Design a protein with these regions (language model features):
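Flexible glycine/proline-enriched surface loops and loop-helix/loop-strand junctions
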Residues: 2, 14-18, 28-34, 87-92, ...
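A cross-kingdom feature strongest in bacterial/archaeal respiratory oxidoreductases
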Residues: 102, 111-116, 131-135, 165-298, ...
């Protein structure tokens, strides 16, 4: 049933998500007339666009004569597409209310059935991935000299996965995965220097950074953050951030304040891999990855930072860098690329594994990099026509994705209209569960951890008169300067 109330076996009453959707979004506050002035689009235009989207999606389907089988075993003779494509990333998501705005757009896509169909928005391999049970962040417990039990970044399933102490204070310096930023999936690197300067949530002795130029990038206050690195504690005379180690290829604001600078190479002078484990370059037609090989020999005293990290790990005899007899495992990053395994059979590169014919998974191959070079430094796996669409529920695709190591099991990936993880955070704020937010964050968590998308004015509008300056500017870096900022731009 899509609507109505159901009594569960345990006696509790429950309603389908669509009942909750209708109960919220049919309220007068969501009517076109209620939002027209706010968004600057007349109500009649909003209704016209909505009608056009619905007409195209449901009355003008894009149909491919391609049979496929879903995860329930049902065979479909055609692929029915809803030719409405919606995209949201930088722009909408750059605003402080963008999280829920993007969620609203994704909900619209799900209601239209315009997810990975002919003519609609499509997944790029190795996605989609099931969430949950994506691995949660690790770091609640740790021991010096031993590796973390998993990745420091991950996907919290609820308050139980937050990296907080018993009293609710953050365990990470950047406060990611705390009650202040429970869904900080990429970490909050822009808060690293301000938090280290403030000693909040704790003081640190060393800040060690690579390439980010955090004195300028993402700080929104270059002068203020630069002063933080030079400021001393009047009580002790010591710097508030005692030691800063930084590696970069060029001079920058952060280099100027570093105690130790490790000169890096440019991307033209080192080995790199564009990995399925990091930021993959796959397409809707299949997974892909690539390498960079050095084409210039450095003419100065520099070393690739990846090589430096491997050397440090080896000299410190850290697990994963030395064998049981104390000998080094990797000579350099070049060897690491083909030799390292995240888990048995899975490494940084997916192509030419094992005997050189393996795709996705396979034993490390000493000739892997040579095979990439012979293939113009790229590897790509082409999906079949049957696997090309409905990847979250396409039996053939999910079996292939499992075989390639992109997912753990060939099971349907359920798309959540109602976010269960957000519901758990809201319930905690309402007093349920063992892990509770601090009282000062309880109201905020209850409001914003809404399992259904909401809209609210950008937070900065509360700090100034929005009517006096109603425009919101979003800056965008050119691709060539994506990892080179401010004073570094002169070098490009």
């Amino acid at each position: 049933a899509l609507v109505g109330e159901v009594v569960l076996p345990n006696g509790l009453a429950a309603v389908p998500v669509f009942e909750l959707l209708a109960g919220r979004y049919l309220l007068p506050e969501y009517a076109p007339e209620s939002v027209a002035e706010r968004c600057g689009v007349p109500a009649e235009t909003i209704r016209r666009i909505a009608a056009e989207i619905a007409d195209v999606a449901f009355n003008q389907p894009l149909v491919l004569n391609q049979p496929w089988t879903d995860t329930a075993g049902r065979r479909h003779e055609t692929m029915i597409g809803r030719p409405v494509a919606i995209h949201a990333m930088r722009g909408i998501s750059a605003h402080s209310n963008g999280f829920h705005t993007c969620r609203a757009l994704h909900m619209l896509q799900m209601l239209l059935g315009a997810i990975d169909t002919p003519g609609s928005w499509r997944y790029k391999a190795p996605y989609p991935k099931p969430l949950p049970p994506g691995p949660p962040p690790v770091g609640k417990t740790w021991e010096a000299g031993k590796p973390l039990a998993g990745s420091p970044l991950g996907f919290p399933r609820g308050p139980e996965d937050l990296l907080v102490a018993a009293d609710g204070t953050p365990l990470r310096l950047d406060k990611a995965f705390s009650w202040e930023a429970p869904l900080g999936l990429h970490g909050l690197m822009h808060m690293l220097l301000p938090n280290a300067h403030a000693g909040d949530p704790y003081p640190v002795d060393v800040v060690f950074m690579y390439m980010a130029n955090m004195a300028w990038n993402s700080s929104m206050d270059p002068l203020g953050v630069s002063r933080m690195m030079a400021e001393k504690d009047p009580a002790t005379g010591a710097y508030r951030i005692p030691h800063i180690i930084y590696s970069d290829a060029f001079y920058s604001e952060t280099v100027a304040y570093a105690d130790l600078v490790l000169p890096d190479t440019t991307y033209l002078e080192r080995w790199d891999c564009i990995s399925l484990l990091d930021r993959p370059i796959g397409s809707p037609h299949g997974p892909a990855d690539a390498i960079r090989q050095p084409i210039l020999k450095p003419d100065r005293d520099v070393r690739p930072f990846q090589d430096v990290l491997i050397e440090l790990g080896t000299r410190l005899k850290l697990p994963g860098f030395v064998a049981a007899d104390g000998s080094r495992i990797y000579a350099d990053y070049k060897e690491y690329i083909w030799k390292h395994e995240r888990k048995p059979g899975t490494g940084p590169l997916g192509g030419f594994r094992g005997d050189g014919t393996g795709n996705g998974v396979g034993a490390p191959n000493p000739g892997q990099l040579d095979a990439y070079i012979a293939n113009d430094c790229f590897w790509r796996y082409e999906l079949s026509e049957e696997e090309g669409y409905f990847k979250h529920a396409n039996k053939a695709y999910l079996e292939t994705a499992t075989r390639l190591g992109m997912i753990g099991a060939p099971e349907q990936i359920v798309l959540q209209l109602y976010s269960e993880p957000l519901a758990k955070f809201r319930l905690a704020a309402q007093g349920h569960g063992k892990v509770q937010p601090p009282d000062r964050l309880r109201e905020r968590t209850a409001r914003f951890a809404d399992p259904l998308p909401i809209w609210y004015p950008p937070l900065e509008d509360a700090m100034e008169d929005a009517s006096a300056y109603p425009l919101h500017a979003v800056t965008q870096r050119p691709a060539a300067m994506y990892h080179s900022w401010h004073s570094q731009n002169a070098w490009l």
